[in-house]
Each structure stands twice: as structure tokens, then as C-alpha cells.
Amino acid sequence: MADAKVDSATEISAKDLKEKKLIEEKENGKDATNGKENEENGEPEIDDEDDDEVDEDDEEGEGDEDEDEDDDDEDLGGGTKRGADDDEDEDEDDEDDVDPKKQKVN
């Protein structure tokens, strides 16, 4: 019977602690209901949990971006070929540009 009295005493103190935490959370601007649910489950309140989920999504998104970057690299590869074509055009432009010395042959 002594055990029963101890259990009821711990329950009262646990309730008091929960109430104190709820009051502190209200004063600090935290959502009291979320804290209460976590405390009832015996789990500590963790706000970073949502952030971790976002980080996982970001990591997956980064992987997708890497695939997109690979496509960009292929586009750049095609761009370098065009760059070589542009070099040839510059040579042709040089041929079209006549030196003023050559024009004064008259």
C-alpha cells in the first residue's frame, strides 16, 4: 500500500511540472499544446524535427539539381563547338576587313 501512495504523489508532482512548463511556454511564446502532447508521450519537445525534414527534401532537391547540371554541361559542350565556329567567322571577318593601305593602291 505504500507503493500506491508514492505513485499518486509522483503523479501529482508530474502534473504540477507539466502545468509549470505550460505556463513557462506561454510566457515564452511557445505553443503550449505541442509541448503538452510531447510531454504526455514522454518525448522531449524538438522544434528541429521539421527542419530536418526540410533538409532531407533539400538534399533530394540538390540531387535533382545535379542531374540538371549534367544537362547544362552537355549544352555547354555544344556551346564550345559553336565557339569554334565563331572563331572561323572571326577569321572570315578579318578577310572582309581590308587594310586601308591595300585600298589606296590607286
Curated annotation (Swiss-Prot):
A Gene Ontology BP annotation from the UniProt entry: positive regulation of transcription by RNA polymerase II
Broad class of where this protein is predominantly found: nucleus
Biased composition (Acidic residues): 40-76, 85-98
Region (Disordered): 1-106
UniProt key word GTP-binding: no
Sequence positions bearing Phosphothreonine: 10
Pfam families: Prothymosin
Cysteines joined through disulfide linkages: none
Family statement: Belongs to the pro/parathymosin family.
Designated name of the protein: Prothymosin alpha-B
Originating organism: Danio rerio (Zebrafish)
Taxonomic classification: Eukaryota, Metazoa, Chordata, Craniata, Vertebrata
